[in-house]
Amino acid sequence: FNRQPSNSSTGELDKEALNFNDDTYYVGFDANQGAELQGQMVVDYIKANADKIDRNGDGVIGYVLAIGDIGHNDSIARTRGVRSALGTGIDANGEVDSTPAGTNVDGKAKVVKDATLDVNGKTYTIRELASQEMKNSAGATWDAATAGNAIGTWSASFGEQIDVVVSNNDGMGMSMFNAWAKDNKVPTFGYYANSDAVAAIAEGYGGTISQHADVQAYLTLRVLRNALDGVDVDTGIGTADDAGNCLTEGEDYRYSEEDRSYYALNVAVTADNYKDFTDSTKVYDKVSKQLDSSKSPSKKVWLDIYNASDNFLSSTYQPLLENYDDLLNLTVDYIGGDGQTESNITNRLGNPSEYDAFAINMVKTDNASSYTSLLK
């Protein structure tokens, strides 16, 4: 879950892992739909506030971009989504190039281009001033502290030109917001709808994307529950279970039979609706009913979180899982990783026979076999 088995260089899905057995599925969110939403959210904000955003009045709306992991499908999709929406993307083999631009104050980088945006009869230049992968010295990606340091470096060098901050996630986004953007009234856009980011919208955070973590967490455990009960995988998902739990396909999620993957659908969270998203750990009303323990008896699940320090996974996703595991009569052992090595996690799966089911959150999307090899 959360990190889809795939080739980190090409994005090609690891079909061997996804077809490990008849009860193997992936649960995540629709990365492309969410990426497009984030990009459009930024464009809409600029159009509505262009005269205020262009802080130095030079006619150039400059943005900086925090990239989470250059080899991660979701990070790639979000970088492409922002560049596509803003018009700054360069074609690379039929896709928008997601390569970090480094520093691009002069607009001469090879992986992005300047774009134009017409607002109320005035034409603005849109420029990606800088972008980099937020990877720390220990190798951990999506690193919030690194993002905070980056905005410090960028703002010291060309701060007056930074009009918008965009991030592949809220952890990095909030780090940059708190370090510089908030005090300088620069709108910052993230992804995940973490509770602190949603609350910060009242203080100038531009917006974020809810990837329906409540639906994702439910699906993560529900597909396991269905397999353990020997019922159709759609039970309690697209088809109501005996308790009345049921999601709406096309509104809450979509399913790809070819990819054996469930994808939660996303929604933009802005100043217009953020108050509806202030509790990120509340279970989804549609799937909040307790299962009958006589029909779905207690089972033991091993579940890892690839990085125990990841803001979204630790403050939103795991609390949701913990709320759902009781409803689904599952006893879950939660294993927190260091965000750097698979062995830090797999070394704690010494006796798989103790468990009835497994939910795997890899450090790197290439490494599904590090786990499946232990389960054969």
Question: What kind of region is each of these model predictions?
Answer:
Residues 82, 108, 113, 118-199, ...:
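Hydrophobic alpha-helical
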Residues 160-167, 178-250, 263, 271:
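Exported/periplasmic ABC-transporter solute-binding proteins
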Residues 59-62, 66-70, 74, 86, ...:
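Hinge/cleft segment of the Venus flytrap/periplasmic-binding protein
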Residues 1-33, 54-62, 194-203, 369-376:
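Flexible loop/hinge segments that line or gate small-molecule binding clefts
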